[in-house]
């Protein structure tokens, strides 16, 4: 065997003995993909989350709407009450030509009539004949009346059944608050005369004083 043949044989042997480097095995196209049910679960989860968010938003809108409706109703009720209470009677102002003192309004007549007719006139005004509350109120009226020489009927009369004076609202007369002068008999009525309260015949003609509560629900104009 010549040298050329030996070299060729050595090369072939070297090629045979050279280690082979195996290429990494190729992966299947589906190896990196998630299973189908995983993808479905993810889709359903996202859809459920979105639905939950929408439900929460809807509930929030509903609650806000209900609260707004309630607030509007309360405001409407308050406004209605305010409108009602700020009406003519709730302004706490007496009608024109009426005197105002504490929580009452007083009307002093300019004409004369019997006690019974005067009582009817006060009723028509939504008032009553004067019911004197105390000495301070009586003093206010005495100071307000310019015609000191006139007598003015008040809502006090003598009843034979009780043998006593009684106010027209049924309240018993208190002699500690008011002193009545003059003859007391059946058919007697009380009137303010000068600086005192006197007993006079109910059929006599006198002027009179009506009163009503300051917040009494009556029209603003005088009748």
UniProtKB/Swiss-Prot annotation:
Function comment: Receptor for CLEC2D/OCIL. Ligand-binding contributes to inhibition of cytotoxic natural killer (NK) cells. May mediate MHC class I-independent 'missing-self' recognition of allografts, tumor cells and virus-infected cells.
Protein name (Swiss-Prot/TrEMBL): Killer cell lectin-like receptor subfamily B member 1B allele B
Keywords for the protein's UniProt record, in alphabetical order: Disulfide bond, Lectin, Membrane, Receptor, Signal-anchor, Transmembrane, Transmembrane helix
Transmembrane portions of the chain: 44-64
Compartments where found: Membrane
Domain of life: Eukaryota
Chain's gene name: Klrb1b
Xref: SUPFAM superfamilies: C-type lectin-like
One GO term of the biological process aspect: negative regulation of natural killer cell mediated cytotoxicity
A GO MF label: signaling receptor activity
